[in-house]
Amino acid sequence: MVSDVFNEGLDLTDLYKAIKGSEMTPEKKVSKLLYDLMLPPSYKGYRYMKDAILMLCDDNYVCTSFTKNIYPVIAEKYGSTSQNIEKNIRSAVNKIYAVNSREDLEKTLGKSPIIYDKPSNVKFITFCAEKLRLER
């Protein structure tokens, strides 16, 4: 259902309705989190960040290095390079921190040092994955 929203090029409101009206799978939880952070699905970094968060949410996935374990896997999936994946995720993190106030970030992410200063890609993705794991 959520993939239909992307394939049909619908907007964030349609995405939210698709997420809200169905069972909350890990993929939908990540989509909702990114929606709540006002990151548009049109950003390439949206897809890449979503994949990275989902990889880290998998209890069986062990990540020792983003540059060796995460970015190359996502790059291969999308026919891109690790450098482009990292750059687009950084752009997405920048967008999130540009459009959200500290209060908005606290409302979505909770009280955490991550809401005060823009974190690195690794810190942001790791934090989001851990937040979603704890909400299970």
Model-predicted segments: where are they?
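Acidic, serine/proline-rich, intrinsically disordered low-complexity segments
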Residues: M1-M24
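Recognition helix of helix-turn-helix DNA-binding domains
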Residues: Q83
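C-terminal output/effector regions of signal-responsive regulators
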Residues: E23-S80, V93-Y97
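Generic detector of leucine side chains in alpha-helical contexts
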Residues: L10-L15, L33-L39, L54-L56, L105, ...
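C-terminal engagement/docking regions of AAA+ P-loop ATPases
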Residues: I70, E76-Y78, K87-R90, N94-R136
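Intrinsic disorder/low-structure terminal segments
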Residues: V5, N60, K123-T126
